Curated annotation (Swiss-Prot):
Domain PUA: 2-81
Pfam families attached to this UniProt entry: Methyltrans_SAM, PUA_3
Protein name: Ribosomal RNA large subunit methyltransferase I
Alphabetized PROSITE patterns for the sequence: PUA
Gene: rlmI
Naturally occurring in which organism (per UniProt): Aliivibrio fischeri (strain ATCC 700601 / ES114)
């Protein structure tokens, strides 16, 4: 028996605008008993069919929409169509930017709620973040194999958000071969080694690709401090852009070793690069106190806010770290600063940077804005898909 969800009166407006989420408070009743991730029919209170989606009984987002087309079944062919649509956009980007690594599926923004797929050459790395994504895993794998016969598929669903969906964390091979320790991708002429199994996220921060390329124009003949460097992404582009000297700072020695390897495979001059194992907050205070200055500071920290109750603390963290960065910049220097916290909108982040300037006793001019790379598109009906924001700031 098909399970049907009926929305409360007046709670269908967002769905009619094609927003893909149905919250628990917006539901009037459920006819039938749905299993975790089961496909359900969604109706307005008056009985009008609106959408077909996946049921998440333990989440505040009680259902996520697969389709607004009543005649569209959620089967292998559905996933094949979505993959082909997504690949069409990425083909344009891959040719334009010389990409062998990119985000193929950006969840709701590509019409597949809770599903993220990053492609590193012939390795497809999946993060399944919702009950519906988990329930349709086999169909998704079948569709990937049909679209990419020579693919290897690896799951990196080792993220805490799955707990909210009633799911355990999972990793492992779904099809093909186990990824090697290093898969080398290329973007904008830069080679990058990716550890799919143990790296952050699915192995690399693909969403910052456009920002990395745009950073090149700020660094020629400059001294650069790359904070939270991970495997050296921004630092590699700084060397590409002609930086005089680049310090990559991170707490992970393994990440720094990979950053150095990345510099080597790109044949960059290692005498211009330094790889420093350090706590960035402590390092910035040391530089401030001993008078060390830089021409450019790149500030790309991890997500400080995972939930709304962490936002206040995150604001303090972002302000403190940007204040410290401003204090170690030469007059006329450039701060490239970013936030990947989706809960923090661009306006709030700009205010935090402005407040940091006041505390640092520096005059700051915002001269450029940054967003997530084009393979992380923003669907017009899903503003929550916008999460990465950044600024280039001239610090006087």
């Amino acid at each position: 028996m098909t399970v049907s969800i009926y929305l409360a009166k007046g709670r269908d407006k967002a769905l009619r605008r094609r927003h893909p989420w149905i919250f628990s408070r917006g539901i009037d009743r459920i006819d039938g008993k749905a299993e975790l991730g089961e496909t359900v029919e969604i109706y307005a209170n008056n009985g009008e069919w609106l959408a077909r989606g996946a049921f998440s009984p333990q989440s505040q987002i009680r259902a996520r929409v697969w389709t607004f087309d009543k005649n569209e079944a959620i089967d292998k062919d559905f996933f094949v169509r979505k993959l082909n649509q997504a690949q069409a956009l990425r083909n344009v980007l891959a040719e334009r930017d010389g990409l062998t690594g990119y985000r193929l599926i950006a969840a709701e923004s590509d019409g597949l709620p809770g599903i993220t797929i990053d492609r590193y050459q012939d390795y497809f790395v999946c993060q399944l973040l919702s009950a519906g994504a988990e329930a349709t895993k086999e169909l998704l794998v079948e569709a990937l194999v049909e679209c990419y016969p020579d693919c290897n598929i690896y799951e990196r669903s080792d993220v805490s958000v799955r707990k909210k969906e009633g799911l355990k964390q999972r990793t492992g091979v779904l099809h093909g071969e186990e990824p090697p320790e290093s898969v080398v991708i290329e973007e904008n002429g830069v080679k990058i080694s990716v550890d799919i199994v143990n790296g952050h996220k699915t192995g690399f921060y693909l969403d910052q690709r456009d920002s990395r390329e745009r950073a090149c124009k700020y660094v020629k003949n400059k001294s650069v401090l790359n904070c939270f460097s991970y495997t050296g992404g921004f630092g590699l582009y700084a060397l590409k852009g002609g930086a005089k000297h680049v310090i990559n700072a991170d707490v992970s020695q393994l990440a720094l070793d990979t950053a150095k390897y990345n510099a080597e495979i790109n044949k960059f001059d290692l005498s211009k690069a330094e790889f420093l194992n350090a706590d960035v907050f402590k390092l910035l205070r040391e530089y401030r106190d001993n008078g060390t200055k830089f021409d450019v500071v790149i500030m790309d920290p991890p997500k400080f806010a995972e939930s709304k109750n962490q936002l206040t603390g995150a604001c303090r963290g972002y302000k403190d770290i940007n204040m410290l960065a401003m204090q170690i910049l030469n007059p006329g220097g450039t701060l490239l600063t970013y936030s990947c916290s989706g809960l923090m909108d661009a306006g709030l982040f700009q205010k935090i940077v402005a407040d940091a300037a006041l505390d640092a006793h520096r005059t700051v001019q915002f001269i450029e804005r940054f967003e997530q790379a084009a393979d992380h598109p923003l669907d017009s009906a899903y503003p929550e898909g916008f999460y990465l924001k950044g600024f280039a700031c001239r610090v006087v």
